[in-house]
């Protein structure tokens, strides 16, 4: 029986800095894909329509999943340490930026501050706008300041903050391990 840490022919050495980059990048790619799958499941199967801020929070995952796969492949193929670290820094920045956006959205949901006017401002009276009124009857506006559901006290925005911070920590671990000489 062989251990996962035992070096095998054709594999990265267990102590290789590239192995840490590969592990971090692949973990981030998988978690980003799971987050997107959960968001799309909630939208398509459970009927939870995302607000504009919810959609914006997906962008980081759309970028992190393929970037993580590319970076993992680069680590597996023996890319230079500087490229691996740069890729992990980009993944860290994506995750931290998304955590900030998620915290902002959670604050909007909890009414700590006002959200963007396109999804949480006052409802504008379009009764004098002619045909626009007829169109509004068929369109449901999803507001950013209304939570569609909470689980253990957190909304999707709250869970996004936690997941994004986890991804940043994983990328940070990858940077620290890859930087070792």
Regions inferred by a protein language model and the residue ranges of each:
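Short, Lys/Arg-rich, polar N-terminal cytosolic tail immediately upstream
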Residues: 1-21
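Interfacial segments of alpha-helical transmembrane regions
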Residues: 18-30, 77-99, 169
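Generic alpha-helical transmembrane segments of integral inner-membrane proteins
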Residues: 30-37, 66, 70, 90-96, ...
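C-terminal TM-helix exit segments that contain a strictly Trp-centered aromatic cap at the helix terminus
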Residues: 34-43, 96-112
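Loop-to-helix transition at the N-terminal end of transmembrane alpha-helices
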Residues: 48-63
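Structural signal for the C-terminal ends of transmembrane alpha-helices
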Residues: 70-78, 172-179
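Extracytosolic (periplasmic/ER-lumenal) interhelical loops and adjacent juxtamembrane/interface segments
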Residues: 110-155
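A hydrophobic membrane-anchoring alpha-helix module
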Residues: 138-181
């Amino acid at each position: 029986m062989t251990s996962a840490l035992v070096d095998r022919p054709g594999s990265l050495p267990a102590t290789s800095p590239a192995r840490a980059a590969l592990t971090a990048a692949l973990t981030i790619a998988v978690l980003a894909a799971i987050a997107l799958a959960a968001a799309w499941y909630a939208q398509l199967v459970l009927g939870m329509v995302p607000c504009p801020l919810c959609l914006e929070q997906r962008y980081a995952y759309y970028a992190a999943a393929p970037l993580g796969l590319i970076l993992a492949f680069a680590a597996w193929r023996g890319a230079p340490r500087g490229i691996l670290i740069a890729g992990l820094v980009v993944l860290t920045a994506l995750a931290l930026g998304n955590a900030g956006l998620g915290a902002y959205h959670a604050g909007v949901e909890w009414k700590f501050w006002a959200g963007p006017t396109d999804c949480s401002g006052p409802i504008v009276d379009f009764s004098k706008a002619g045909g626009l009124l007829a169109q509004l009857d068929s369109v449901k506006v999803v507001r950013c300041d209304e939570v569609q559901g909470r689980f253990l006290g957190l909304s999707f925005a709250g869970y996004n903050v936690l997941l994004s911070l986890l991804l940043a920590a994983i990328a940070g671990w990858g940077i620290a391990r890859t930087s070792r000489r």
